[in-house]
């Protein structure tokens, strides 16, 4: 699996892994698998992180770089499921005027009730960080929101 990676990808993985190697001994707590993958511009769901060995608690499992490289390769290979374009198409369904905007309240509803749901306590910081101000009619442009959420800016 790692043979599918370019030398540049392997170097990027080594660098990102080293950031989460807090002990400096070539290992990383599996709790940080998702964070490390996100640092490598991947956006795995919680289900994917769990599937590849990520843990919900610290110190449940320790992995080596040699174990993480194939994890990265697999998630990178599968990243087309749920691409930026797919998410854009979903948000366009809520763009009734076809002008690049949607109701702020609808976005809140989507984030609280569909897919990997956010908790109410998680919602406010996400919207504050990623959303432009809503206009006087309660609409926001959804493309800047999506770009920030998928780290494409």
Swiss-Prot record:
InterPro entries: CALM/Myosin/TropC-like, EF-hand-dom_pair, EF_hand_dom. Keywords: Allergen, Glycoprotein, Motor protein, Muscle protein, Myosin, Repeat. This is Myosin light chain 1. Myosin is a hexamer of 2 heavy chains and 4 light chains. The keyword Metal-binding does not apply. Thermostable even up to 100 degrees Celsius. Muscle (at protein level). Transmembrane segments: none annotated. It comes from the Eukaryota. Stable at acidic (pH 1.0-5.0) and alkaline (pH 9.0 and 11.0) conditions. GO terms for biological process: muscle system process. GO terms for cellular component: muscle myosin complex. PROSITE patterns: EF_HAND_2. One of its GO terms (molecular function) is calcium ion binding. The keyword Glycoprotein applies. Residues 8-43, 82-117, 135-153 form the EF-hand domain.
């Amino acid at each position: 699996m790692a043979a599918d990676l370019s030398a540049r990808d392997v170097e990027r993985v080594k660098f990102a892994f080293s950031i989460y190697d807090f002990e400096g001994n070539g290992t990383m707590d599996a709790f940080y698998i998702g964070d490390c993958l996100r640092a490598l511009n991947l956006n795995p769901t919680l289900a994917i992180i769990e599937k590849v060995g990520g843990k919900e608690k610290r110190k449940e499992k320790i992995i080596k770089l040699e174990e993480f490289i194939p994890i990265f390769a697999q998630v990178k290979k599968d990243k087309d499921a749920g691409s930026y374009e797919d998410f854009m198409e979903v948000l366009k369904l809520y763009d009734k005027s076809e002008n690049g905007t949607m109701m702020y309240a609808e976005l809140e509803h989507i984030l609280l009730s569909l897919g990997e749901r956010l908790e109410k306590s998680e919602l406010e910081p996400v919207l504050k960080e990623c959303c432009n101000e809503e206009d006087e009619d309660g609409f926001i442009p959804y493309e800047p929101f999506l770009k920030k959420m998928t780290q494409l800016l």
